[in-house]
């Protein structure tokens, strides 16, 4: 073999063993659409009684995807509002054959402001004072 043929073979090997340049892949546009998130602010907290086994069901009923929309209501109550319960707040339940009229009053003789209350409660629960176990019962540490 002469010099030129051996050089040709080496050049062929280099060109065949060198990787071919692959153009970079184009990024696909994400076609996912973001569904709007429904945020529910509770300005009129109410007290409900339920057993631990029904608690999750109650929460989902009140705040879940199929929850009824609540009418807009003010976030501040004055002392005048507390003395007059409206008809929708009345709860007439028969108890052992008797009918009792009970109503929920947001706070007695005080002005209620939702942002101030929620800030205070978040600090209270983040302190670790209460412990919620996997069964959903709340117990103090």
UniProtKB/Swiss-Prot annotation:
One of its GO terms (cellular component) is chloroplast. Functions as activator of WRKY33 in plant defense against necrotrophic pathogens by stimulating the DNA-binding activity of WRKY33. It comes from Arabidopsis thaliana. Interacts with sigma factors in chloroplast. Interacts with WRKY33 in the nucleus. This is Sigma factor binding protein 2, chloroplastic. The gene is SIB2. A motif (VQ) lies at residues 55-64. Residues 24-36 have a biased composition (Basic residues). Induction: By infection with the necrotrophic fungal pathogen B.cinerea. Pfam families: VQ. Residues 1-38 form a transit peptide. Residues 1-36 are annotated as: Disordered.
């Amino acid at each position: 073999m002469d010099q030129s043929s051996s050089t040709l073979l080496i050049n062929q090997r280099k060109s065949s063993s060198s990787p071919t340049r692959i153009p970079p892949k184009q990024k696909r546009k994400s076609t996912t659409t973001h569904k709007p998130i429904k945020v529910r602010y509770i300005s009129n907290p109410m007290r409900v009684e339920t057993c631990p086994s029904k608690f999750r069901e109650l929460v989902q009923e009140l705040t879940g995807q199929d929850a009824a929309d609540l009418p807009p209501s003010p976030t501040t109550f004055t002392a005048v509002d507390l003395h007059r319960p409206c008809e929708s707040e009345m709860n007439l339940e028969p108890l052992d054959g008797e009918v009792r009229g009970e109503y929920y009053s947001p706070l007695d003789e005080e002005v209620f402001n939702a942002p101030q209350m929620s800030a205070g409660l978040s600090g209270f629960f983040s302190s670790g004072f209460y412990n919620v176990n996997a069964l959903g019962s709340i117990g103090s540490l």
